[in-house]
């Protein structure tokens, strides 16, 4: 479990430092990586390409780990994330990562889930829900 937590911490630190500190060692050659909003990458080389390209367009400001859960070969990480894109857009949200590890200790599957920070009770004013005018975000 400790090795898996180190692997996740390494992955997050790569984003914070904008530096490949061993993507090909961290992810298996056949790894599948699913972002919460739709993109899917196949293989460590594809993940490395995405990492390098994304970091030309933005900066991860925070990726704080809140807690880990472990079961079998899987690890779940709860986190807080913040970025700033070069075009002025910024994102702040909470999320979770489900990661599976192979027999070599490499990540062979990773799926991210995001959660909007702007939460509210649509029934606080009565039986008819009042939903926010904010456009739904899919993290």
Predicted segments, located by residue:
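Intrinsic disorder/low-complexity signal
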Residues: 1-2, 19, 34, 77, ...
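A solvent-exposed, acidic/Ser-Thr-rich amphipathic alpha-helical stretch
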Residues: 3, 20-72
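A beta-strand edge to alpha-helix "cap/lid" segment located at domain peripheries
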Residues: 52-139
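Hydrophobic pocket/interface hotspot
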Residues: 11, 23-24, 31, 43, ...
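Alpha-helix C-capping/helix-to-loop hinge sites
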Residues: 11-14, 34, 83
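Short, low-complexity N-terminal intrinsically disordered segments enriched in polar/charged residues
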Residues: 1-29, 130-139
């Amino acid at each position: 479990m400790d090795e898996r937590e180190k692997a996740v911490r390494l992955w997050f630190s790569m984003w914070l430092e904008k530096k490949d500190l061993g993507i090909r060692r961290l992810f298996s050659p056949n790894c599948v990586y699913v972002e919460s909003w739709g993109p899917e990458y196949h293989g460590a080389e594809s993940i490395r390409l995405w990492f390098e390209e994304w970091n030309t367009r933005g900066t991860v400001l925070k990726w704080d780990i809140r807690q880990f859960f472990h079961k079998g070969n899987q690890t779940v990480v709860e986190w807080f994330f913040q970025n700033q894109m070069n075009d002025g857009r910024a994102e702040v949200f909470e999320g979770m990562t489900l990661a599976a590890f192979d027999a070599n200790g490499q990540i062979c599957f990773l799926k991210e889930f995001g959660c909007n920070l702007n939460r509210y009770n649509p029934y606080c004013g009565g039986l008819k829900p009042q939903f926010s005018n904010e456009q739904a975000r899919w993290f």
